[in-house]
């Protein structure tokens, strides 16, 4: 599998705090069958403002750590970019990275961002010649159970990503993210999802869940669909090919 949304670089955002935590995440991801991981540390004004130099420096250390985990584990560079207007200039001047230096950029919004703002932001990114991959579309209230809006964004030229944790079956009691799982299921049923990725941060609260999600998608939608969402489409993104 290929995971295009992950927080594996230590001490740069709300992901791993140490080299050891980074290594544990990589090892668990590899155990689940992931062989390529795009590191997408947060870039968010006012919240995650770690200098690019430090992110890049720690990323290179994580790439070395990956060699200790497995010789065939590939780590690529990227970013999860929270949209604010200044992002456009940074993307245009290549001050923040796309996914593995491709045409694709992983873009996120707040849960309560109005649809018109999402639409406007993505339009501006597309005008730069960059293709947005909308991170965890199940989070956004403006897209909830709204095939028309998601289809409109796809028709504009955007792609969509759902978190593997939200593909899992809801727990009977105390399920905090049940509504997101319902949204993810709706998007999958409507065939509005291009990629499933982990958005892993740590092994305690936010582990990969890739193997379990792959099995569930296979059971519900077939092996070909699972391969498309976990392998084929992510590979095209990493290799800068059209989906």
Swiss-Prot record:
InterPro entries: Caps_polysacc_synth_CpsB (IPR048208), Caps_polysacc_synth_CpsB/CapC (IPR016667), Metal_Hydrolase (IPR032466). Its cofactor is Mn(2+). Its EC number is 3.1.3.48. The keyword Lipid metabolism does not apply. GO terms for biological process: capsule polysaccharide biosynthetic process. It comes from Streptococcus pneumoniae serotype 4 (strain ATCC BAA-334 / TIGR4). Keywords: Capsule biogenesis/degradation, Exopolysaccharide synthesis, Hydrolase, Manganese, Protein phosphatase. Pathway: Capsule biogenesis; capsule polysaccharide biosynthesis. It comes from the Bacteria. GO terms for molecular function: manganese ion binding; protein tyrosine phosphatase activity. Pfam families: CpsB_CapC. Dephosphorylates CpsD. Involved in the regulation of capsular polysaccharide biosynthesis. This is Tyrosine-protein phosphatase CpsB. It is an enzyme of class 3 (hydrolase). SUPFAM superfamilies: Metallo-dependent hydrolases. It catalyses: O-phospho-L-tyrosyl-[protein] + H2O = L-tyrosyl-[protein] + phosphate.
């Amino acid at each position: 599998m290929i995971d295009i949304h992950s927080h594996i670089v230590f001490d740069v955002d709300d992901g791993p705090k140490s080299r050891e935590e980074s290594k544990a995440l990589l090892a668990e991801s590899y155990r689940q069958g992931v062989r390529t991981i795009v590191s997408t540390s947060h870039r968010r004004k006012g919240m995650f403002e770690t200098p690019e130099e430090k992110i890049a420096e720690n990323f290179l250390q994580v790439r070395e750590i990956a060699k200790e985990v497995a010789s065939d584990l590939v780590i690529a560079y990227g970013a999860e970019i929270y949209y604010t207007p200044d992002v456009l200039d940074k993307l245009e001047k290549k001050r923040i990275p796309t996914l593995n230096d491709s045409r694709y950029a992983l873009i996120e919004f707040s849960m309560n961002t109005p649809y018109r703002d999402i639409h406007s932001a993505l339009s501006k990114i597309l005008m730069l010649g960059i293709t947005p991959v909308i991170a965890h579309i199940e989070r956004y209230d403006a897209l909830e159970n709204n095939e028309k809006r998601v289809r409109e964004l796809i028709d504009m030229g955007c792609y969509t990503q759902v978190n593997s944790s939200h593909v899992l079956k809801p727990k009977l009691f105390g399920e905090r993210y049940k509504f997101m799982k319902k949204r993810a299921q709706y998007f999958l049923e409507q065939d509005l999802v291009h990629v499933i990725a982990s958005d892993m941060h740590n092994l305690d609260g936010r582990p990969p869940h890739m193997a379990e999600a792959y099995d569930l998608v296979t059971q519900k939608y077939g092996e070909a669909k699972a391969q498309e969402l976990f392998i084929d489409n992510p590979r095209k993104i990493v290799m800068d090919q059209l989906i």
